[in-house]
């Protein structure tokens, strides 16, 4: 069961001249709302809910909220997944940090902040089941429709858009700044674009401008 097809998104899309990418910038309020939607659907489905496992690092900032909305007991368990081996991209995701606690006999709810291409969760599910879990159900705050894997529960589905998460400001700004400069966008226009991107989260503007200023011209 998923809650795909939501039409009441509060997250506007942003596009800019000369840049083919569409950006989505969820606020902390948006993400808490998506976590609540996801958890409410999971609880209503009647699946067994006992233990939350979160894929680190991306989902960690939102895991406590979802864990509490689910009504799961005990501490949150983490598992580290990655496609990267230093500067080399692996063919498939691998477990790079084992489960932080035992899951033997547990009904696990596996959480990630975004499912993009869908290669991470299946590997994590296999590892959790091999580690003795009784069952695994999955949830993602944001799901990209291009993914080959569909989680059981989804906060919101989007197209192939660049999601800038609040926890990911520095690396996102560094990449976007470099990209826009390479496209020939002047500094004044870059600042204007960033102000537009983060108009719904004005407390982040100072961070954005600071990190942009650190990117070599």
Where are these regions (language model features)?
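PRPP-associated nucleotide enzymes
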Residues: 1-217
């Amino acid at each position: 069961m998923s809650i795909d097809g939501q039409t009441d998104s509060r997250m506007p899309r942003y596009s800019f001249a000369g840049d083919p990418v569409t950006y989505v910038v969820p606020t902390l309020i948006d993400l808490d709302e998506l976590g609540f939607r996801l958890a409410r659907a999971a609880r209503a489905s009647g699946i067994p809910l006992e233990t939350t496992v979160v894929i680190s690092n991306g989902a960690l900032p939102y895991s406590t909220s979802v864990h509490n909305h689910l009504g799961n007991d005990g501490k949150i368990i983490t598992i580290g997944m990655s496609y990267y081996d230093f500067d080399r991209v692996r063919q498939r995701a691998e477990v790079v940090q084992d489960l932080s606690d035992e899951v033997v006999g547990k009904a696990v709810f596996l959480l990630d902040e975004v499912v993009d291409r869908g290669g991470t969760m299946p590997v994590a599910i296999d590892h959790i089941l091999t580690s003795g879990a009784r069952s695994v159900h999955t949830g993602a705050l944001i799901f990209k429709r291009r993914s080959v894997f569909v989680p059981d529960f989804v906060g919101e589905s989007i197209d192939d858009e660049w999601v800038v998460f609040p926890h990911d400001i520095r690396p996102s700004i560094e990449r976007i700044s470099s990209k826009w400069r390479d496209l020939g966008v002047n500094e004044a226009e870059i600042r204007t674009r960033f102000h537009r991107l983060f108009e719904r989260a004005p407390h982040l503007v100072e961070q954005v401008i600071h990190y942009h200023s650190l990117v070599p011209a």
